Amino acid sequence: MAMLESYLKKQVLVLTADGRSIIGTLRGIDQTINVVLEKCHERVYSDEGIEVIPLGVHLIKGDDVAVIGEVDDELDKKLNLKEIIAEPMKPIVH
């Protein structure tokens, strides 16, 4: 939990258990890893490049969080998302 608190007010990427990739500014987190992101968007991967879907403020339930990581803003801005070809992530299977 303390590690995640160091990400507050920073840009993070959240990978969800159903395979979604959501990027935004971490505004809140609780003991069950419920996550509040602001200014966020989802990146949908396909063989036609990455589609960016604006979400605004978004709450992700802790049960749905697979991974949270800090995003390097400078590197992220250099990416040409239309040129990145990738299959969508598959959901986590327990």
From Swiss-Prot:
Molecular function GO labels: mRNA binding; RNA binding
GO cellular component, one term: U6 snRNP
The entry's keywords: mRNA processing, mRNA splicing, Nucleus, Ribonucleoprotein, RNA-binding, Spliceosome
UniProt keyword annotation of Nucleus present: yes
Major localisation: nucleus
Domain Sm: 1-74
Cellular compartments annotated: Nucleus
Matches recorded under PANTHER family: LSM1, U6 SNRNA-ASSOCIATED SM-LIKE PROTEIN LSM8
Family: Belongs to the snRNP Sm proteins family.
Quaternary structure note: Component of the precatalytic spliceosome (spliceosome B complex). Component of the U4/U6-U5 tri-snRNP complex, a building block of the precatalytic spliceosome (spliceosome B complex). LSM2, LSM3, LSM4, LSM5, LSM6, LSM7 and LSM8 form a heptameric, ring-shaped subcomplex (the LSM2-8 complex) that is part of the U4/U6-U5 tri-snRNP complex and the precatalytic spliceosome.
Name this protein carries in UniProt: Probable U6 snRNA-associated Sm-like protein LSm8
